[in-house]
């Protein structure tokens, strides 16, 4: 039930918080409302019950297992939230002078250095406010680099067919033509096709390593050599950095620029429309083009770098320093774990994925790439279940909800039919993984004997199966549009 449906004229809830502003102010007439806001008239108890009930319907990492592939839904430690909320951080005004912000600036400077060490890239900018914005910034730097050299004929970005959807979007937004590279049957990039398509028009290639197939790209050195010899640059999509943290660095693999998803690898909060952060790290040749602001250290302390320091910068992506609260959480996460702890993150992430893959194949599921070792995630293909029982990957995903497990990513990457992309992060215990295997075994047995149970799932949730096409084409977010 929507809160508007509880509304009844005359009901109201009095605010029980002190007034935050003085009564002695005036709003210019042109900014004043011409009619009162159409707020629901409800009692305080109704409001409390309504939102409490909604909160109990939420599914989160704090409540249940969340094996959403390519999303790294790991636990967000409460201690880092507390540290990032220290008064010296949260009470600082964005326009505070440098000499009044030395602790804050020093923290960001250290974070830049930590990211540089983790990625193997000397330049770091923290300003992008999401992974997708960091990705856009990275491609924009590639474009700025080629343009500064007068190499304007480079108008193509090479992207594998298993890439995240943001990759081609970022390339197109920066004015490039997307050239797709096929995946070979073994899950690696088709090198022969890459050799045919790379050339004088190639500005760069965008790769995720490990890929969205959950497989490490074994020919990365050869790929880097081919693209660099052609005059292009390598972009690293940092979505799957959790798999190689402390083991291998993108800069050492030959990448020139990358973004980091702090909400994945470094345990900052997911979702809700933000706030987010997607810092970018770059090789030496792209440092002049980094987005501002960045923090520099001088004899007099820590300061914001300016256009004078980076005259070729692609500019600003936000008014201030991105989403500082998220950056602080990532900093404290790194500080708490340390170098050895971050190494164990990738070790346990890959251990969990390979253990879970092995156990699921034991109960009858089919790995999309049975001859390859999983990185931090893996793909099951339910093509045989669809043929034998007439149930789809979506049916399996919906049925998982009835057992209190969030569905894995479905139908991505598109090149694997009827696929589930499963990622069990390092924070999950063996007991949790075993429980998931037990549920998956039950659901597979249901599919073989009572397929209609899966086709009608979920059975325990207030919202069943939505009409996705209708929702996309007839977006209705205004209650009063249909309830006048």
Swiss-Prot record:
Enzyme Commission identifier(s): 1.4.4.2
Location of N6-(pyridoxal phosphate)lysine modifications: 264
Listed InterPro entries: Aminotrans_V_dom, GcvPB, GDC-P_C, GDC_P, PyrdxlP-dep_Trfase, PyrdxlP-dep_Trfase_major, PyrdxlP-dep_Trfase_small
Keywords: Oxidoreductase, Pyridoxal phosphate
Pfam assignment, any one: GcvP2_C
GO cellular component, one term: glycine cleavage complex
Catalyzed reaction equations: N(6)-[(R)-lipoyl]-L-lysyl-[glycine-cleavage complex H protein] + glycine + H(+) = N(6)-[(R)-S(8)-aminomethyldihydrolipoyl]-L-lysyl-[glycine-cleavage complex H protein] + CO2
GO biological process per UniProt: glycine decarboxylation via glycine cleavage system
Keyword Cell inner membrane: no
Cofactor: pyridoxal 5'-phosphate
An example Gene Ontology molecular-function term: glycine dehydrogenase (decarboxylating) activity
Quaternary assembly: The glycine cleavage system is composed of four proteins: P, T, L and H. In this organism, the P 'protein' is a heterodimer of two subunits.
Function: The glycine cleavage system catalyzes the degradation of glycine. The P protein binds the alpha-amino group of glycine through its pyridoxal phosphate cofactor; CO(2) is released and the remaining methylamine moiety is then transferred to the lipoamide cofactor of the H protein.
Family, similarity comment: Belongs to the GcvP family. C-terminal subunit subfamily.
PANTHER family: GLYCINE DEHYDROGENASE (DECARBOXYLATING), MITOCHONDRIAL, GLYCINE DEHYDROGENASE, DECARBOXYLATING
Protein name: Probable glycine dehydrogenase (decarboxylating) subunit 2
UniProt organism field: Legionella pneumophila subsp. pneumophila (strain Philadelphia 1 / ATCC 33152 / DSM 7513)
């Amino acid at each position: 039930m929507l809160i508007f449906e509880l509304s009844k004229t005359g009901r109201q809830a009095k605010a029980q918080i002190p007034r935050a502003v003085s009564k002695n102010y005036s709003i210019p007439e042109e900014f004043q409302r011409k009619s009162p806001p159409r707020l629901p008239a409800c009692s305080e108890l109704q409001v409390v019950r309504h939102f409490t009930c909604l909160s109990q319907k939420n599914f989160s990492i704090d409540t249940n297992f969340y094996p959403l592939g390519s999303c790294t839904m790991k636990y967000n430690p409460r201690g880092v939230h507390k540290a990032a909320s220290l008064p010296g951080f949260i009470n600082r005004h964005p326009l505070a002078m440098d000499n009044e912000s030395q602790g804050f600036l020093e923290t960001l400077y250290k974070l830049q250095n930590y990211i540089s060490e983790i990625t193997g890239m000397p330049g770091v900018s923290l300003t992008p406010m999401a992974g997708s914005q960091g990705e856009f910034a990275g491609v924009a730097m590639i474009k700025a680099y080629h343009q500064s050299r007068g190499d304007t004929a480079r108008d193509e970005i090479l992207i594998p067919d298993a890439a995240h959807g943001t990759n081609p979007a970022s390339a197109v937004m920066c004015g490039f033509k997307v050239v797709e590279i096929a995946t070979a049957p073994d899950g690696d990039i088709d090198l022969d096709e890459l050799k045919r398509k790379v050339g004088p028009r190639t500005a760069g290639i965008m790769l995720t390593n490990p890929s969205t197939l959950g497989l490490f790209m074994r020919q990365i050195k050869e790929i880097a050599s081919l693209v660099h010899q052609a005059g292009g640059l390598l972009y690293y999509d940092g979505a799957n950095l959790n798999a190689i943290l402390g083991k291998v660095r993108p800069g050492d693999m030959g990448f020139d620029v990358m973004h980091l998803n702090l909400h994945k690898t470094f345990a900052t909060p997911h979702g809700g429309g933000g706030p987010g952060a997607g810092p970018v790290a770059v090789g030496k040749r792209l440092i002049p083009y980094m987005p501002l602001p960045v923090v520099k250290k001088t004899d007099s302390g820590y300061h914001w770098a300016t256009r004078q320091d980076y005259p070729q910068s692609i500019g600003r992506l936000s008014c201030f320093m991105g989403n500082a609260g998220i950056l602080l959480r990532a900093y404290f996460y790194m500080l708490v774990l340390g170098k050895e702890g971050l190494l164990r993150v990738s070790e346990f992430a890959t251990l969990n994925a390979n253990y879970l893959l092995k156990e699921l194949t034991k109960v009858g599921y089919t790995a999309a790439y049975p001859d390859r070792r999983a990185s931090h995630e893996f793909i099951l293909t339910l093509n045989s279940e669809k043929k034998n029982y007439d149930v789809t990957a979506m049916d399996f995903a919906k049925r998982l909800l009835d057992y209190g497990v969030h569905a894995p990513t479905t139908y991505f990457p598109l090149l694997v039919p009827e696929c589930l992309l499963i990622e069990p992060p390092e924070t999950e215990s063996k007991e949790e993984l075993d429980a998931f295997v037990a549920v998956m075994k039950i659901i597979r047995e249901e599919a073989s004997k009572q397929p209609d149970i899966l086709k009608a799932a979920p059975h325990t949730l207030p919202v069943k199966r939505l009409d996705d096409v209708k929702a996309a084409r007839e977006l209705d977010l205004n209650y009063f549009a249909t309830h006048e």
